UniProtKB/Swiss-Prot annotation:
It comes from Homo sapiens. InterPro entries: ARM-type_fold, HEAT_MROH2B-like, Maestro-like_HEAT, Maestro_heat-like_prot. The lineage of its organism: Eukaryota, Metazoa, Chordata, Craniata, Vertebrata. The gene is MROH8. Coiled coil: none annotated. It comes from the Eukaryota. This is Protein MROH8. It holds the Pfam family HEAT_Maestro.
């Protein structure tokens, strides 16, 4: 697909994607996890350990790389005209879609002159940074969940055209790597072709065939990737392409939000959230597999086994999340690291401030308690969590939810490595004037051995406090702890 072939046609092309349909809804193929049960002693974690998704198998792409259409050499006048047009963009800004498309077309046309025209070659190589910056802007300006024009396709075509002439815009520097990441994000964030078609039916623009544009865009993206290694097939370039360019920076935050929405009082919202969290589970499994530390293989295998055993109990994995947020915590707990667990807790508490519907609050309480019970030993930011609990307990009105949160505090305080941290936060709040913290003291529920340990640590802290200067003492006068 050279610049000469930039018009959408009805030609069938293969894309690395599939339609989403009710008959082919994503579901964990649990049989693929049998390798874990049968070979648990194996040291290496293989790709077979990761569940596959029926319905999303890709047909192989064409093995024939795209070649630019042979054209007559460009005259010096045309080359100069193209350079002036491109330079004008660098000196100004692209305002309309036609102007943007013209800029991309000019770049592709000029790329064809690189093998024989020194002026074109010198201009392109001296303006790599400008080209990368402009393409970055064009990709960023595209709506992430929409495909209403051929702009993405044109960007991919232009990058490929230059790559075939040994001008690589996605490799070799930080800004080029950023452009590479943006192009991949622009594809990943696209909804399914069915969703895009439905949007077009509701808001027709009459400019293009959505399905054709969707397929052409994916084909252009595929050929752009191929172009990166066709001319320079070195292993380091392959590694750059294969290496995962995206990672969830706030996975715990995302899981918590989706989990809370699974308990939304509006049935439609809860159902869509359940489907979304199911898809997120598949993405998380794949990400964790690709990025996991070799030293942590056994932990990942255990998490996969637990996930498999849990989902075997439910005929539909997506439906098992609907109105049952605590199950989400059970499934995801093994795939969240300590930072992500903290994000999960913080997001759940933050949501309690803005979403005060009883259903949401109940979901939040169940999520917190379930996660704390199963992963309490993995938390590394207990001080931050306790700070949030002490500050926000007053906004939680439902007795059941308050009790669940207090039970979470009980779990933390009963673990020796967290006892002093929890006591410090509770003692630093003036109990006689804070009925919410007084309730925490009264409702703490721990086993007898833990009670003895906690009381001993509490007495030690009280003694230490009385031995310190007055200005350094904690802000409390007395603490009454019911037996």
């Amino acid at each position: 697909m050279s610049s000469k072939h930039r018009i959408c046609s009805q030609e069938e092309v293969v894309i690395p994607c599939a339609y989403d349909s009710d008959s082919e809804s994503v579901d964990l193929e649990l049989s693929n996890l049998e390798i874990i049960k049968k070979g648990s002693s194996s040291i290496e974690l293989t790709d077979l350990d990761i569940p596959d998704i029926p319905g999303l198998h890709c047909e192989p792409l064409s093995h024939s790389p795209r070649h630019l259409t042979q054209q007559d050499p460009l005259s010096e006048a045309i080359v100069e005209k193209l350079i002036q047009s491109i330079q004008k963009v660098f000196n100004g800004e692209l305002k309309g879609e036609l102007e943007k498309l013209k800029f991309l077309g000019d770049l592709s046309s000029l790329s064809q002159a690189l093998p024989y025209d020194e002026t074109a070659k010198s201009f392109i190589h001296s303006h790599i940074a400008d080209i990368v910056h402009t393409l970055n802007v064009l990709v960023q300006e595209e709506r992430p969940h929409s495909l209403s024009s051929s702009m993405r396709q044109e960007v991919f075509v232009t990058i490929a055209d230059l790559s075939y002439q040994d001008v690589h815009l996605l490799l070799g520097s930080e800004d080029r790597a950023e452009l590479f990441s943006l192009t991949i994000k622009s594809i990943i964030t696209l909804p399914s072709v069915r969703t895009l078609t439905q949007i077009q039916e509701i808001m027709p623009n009459g400019t293009c065939n959505t399905e054709c544009l969707y397929r052409q865009t994916f084909q252009a993206f595929s050929e752009m990737l191929q172009s990166l290694v066709v001319k320079d097939p070195h292993l380091e370039n392959l590694d750059t392409i294969i290496k995962l360019p995206l990672r969830f920076q706030r996975l715990g935050h995302l899981v918590a939000l989706m989990a809370l929405l699974c308990g939304d009082p509006q049935e439609k919202v809860a159902e869509e959230a359940a489907e979304g969290i199911h898809s997120l589970l598949h993405i998380t499994l794949r990400l964790k597999y690709i990025t996991h530390d070799k030293k942590d293989q056994q932990n990942l295998k255990r998490a996969l086994t637990k996930c498999r055993e849990f989902l075997e109990l439910h005929s539909s994995a997506a439906k098992c999340f609907y109105n049952c947020p605590f199950r989400i915590a059970q499934v995801f707990e093994g795939f969240l690291d300590s930072n992500e667990l903290c994000q999960f807790i913080m997001t759940t508490f933050d949501t309690l401030k803005t979403l005060k519907h009883p259903c949401i609050q109940r979901s939040a309480g169940e999520l917190l308690l379930t996660l704390a019970k199963n992963t309490e030993s993995q938390f590394e930011k207990v001080p931050e969590i306790m700070g949030v609990i002490c500050a926000q307990l007053s906004i939680i009105s439902q007795p059941r939810v308050r009790q669940q949160i207090i039970n979470t505090v009980s779990l933390f305080i009963s673990r020796p490595k967290y006892t002093d941290i929890v006591l410090s936060f509770l003692l630093c709040h003036p109990v006689p004037y804070n009925r919410h913290l007084a309730e925490v003291w009264r409702m703490l529920s721990v086993e007898l051995p833990s009670t003895t340990w906690i009381l001993w640590r509490l007495l030690r802290k009280l003694q230490k406090c009385h031995n310190e200067p007055a200005q350094e003492k904690m802000a409390y006068v007395a603490v009454a702890v019911s037996p």
